[in-house]
Design a protein with these regions (language model features):
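Conserved beta-strand/loop scaffold segments within soluble protein domains that form the structured core
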Residues: 2-126, 140, 147-167
Length: 167
């Protein structure tokens, strides 16, 4: 999916979060472009991918700060979890800044389930498959816990559980 947002008013705020769970040979292609066009704007983006089997997640994100968008504060993060030997992640967070007095950052992480976390949970008597699910849910929790609408939160958690049960 592609999301484009342009802040056209001073002091505008945006929070944009997403989670994708490609599996088998699926490709989840996420593209965001946020243009800060006025002063004192704030944005927070958090995008997470959990690539299973031979699934592939692609993230291309851009924050553009125009010359008049002084005092802008923009942040974009893309965290990725690889769950299959053939799973792939391509991530490209970008900043395009044309103003001097701004605070913007971007970052990306790609990793697998930590063996030490698995060992800790297994040493407490938790089955391997359940321990993996707990770690994956913890990875996604930063997004799911921030959902204020209980109907949407329930739907997202059910969808994550459904995708994980197929692995």
């Amino acid at each position: 999916y592609t999301t484009l947002f342009r802040s056209t008013g001073e002091n505008s705020e945006l929070s944009m979060n997403s989670v994708v769970l490609p599996k088998a040979n699926e490709i989840a292609d996420t593209r965001t472009w946020l243009v800060h066009g006025e002063k004192n704007c704030l944005s927070r983006q958090l995008h997470k991918s959990i690539a299973m089997d031979a699934g592939k997640a692609v993230f291309n994100g851009m924050i553009t700060v125009t010359p008049q968008a002084l005092k802008t504060d923009g942040q974009m993060t893309n965290n990725n979890l690889l769950l299959g030997d053939k799973a792939q992640i391509d991530t490209k967070p970008q900043l395009e800044i044309y103003a001097d007095d701004v605070k913007c950052s971007h970052g990306a992480t790609v990793g697998r389930i930590d063996d030490e976390q698995l060992f800790y949970l297994r040493s407490r008597g938790i089955a391997l498959s359940e321990a993996r699910k707990m770690i994956i849910h913890a990875f996604a929790a930063e997004l799911t816990e921030s959902l204020e609408n209980s109907v949407i939160k329930t739907h997202v958690l059910e969808r994550i559980n459904q995708r994980l049960s197929e692995v």
